């Protein structure tokens, strides 16, 4: 248990000087309380280490979906194109994600830089590079169904969860945002968001009811609620999904 604690602690980020205060309802991951939640025996954190290895800061104000996608693809070891400036090494970046013909034909980088992405566009972009993606709009999820997705998804190493939510429902400033989810504590009913706007907010534990309200907000660009996507690597995408309450 001590070894596990040390390995998890070593992956904890240090928030940059000047990062915004954590909202009153949130618990910063790098606070003593946040670390305690992460290290609890019952906490589902199967995705945490892999995501932390590839934790990204979004390249511009609208690239939250792009940064989240890059984190997910790299953490799942999805085959990537060459990364400019890194010789023959291949990994996903916020630039080369748009050099793949299938993704480039789906959405243009210039448009995302202006407008960001809707839940549907996030789903389509990730699917365009070969992953298996399931999309859940907040309007179609009950609170218990969301809890089930968190319990199951964050206890398994072979999938990733990314949320599209309204910051205001979490007591944060701003509007629509996208970031990966990394852990779930069933005792306090809190989920860890690895916020890709690292210059603005820290990685934070929020309550599941708050996240549920945040993903049920309407995205005016699409006219539908926000929500979350669950991503699997290409090999797993062809396997039948495990039955559940959704």
Predicted regions and their residues:
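Cysteine-nucleophile protease catalytic domains, especially the papain-like/related folds used
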Residues: 22-141, 220, 232-245
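Noncatalytic regulatory segments and standalone regulatory/sensor domains
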Residues: 186-246
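Active-site-adjacent substructure of cysteine-protease-like catalytic cores
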Residues: 141-192
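Sec/Tat signal peptide C-region and signal peptidase I cleavage site
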Residues: 15-19
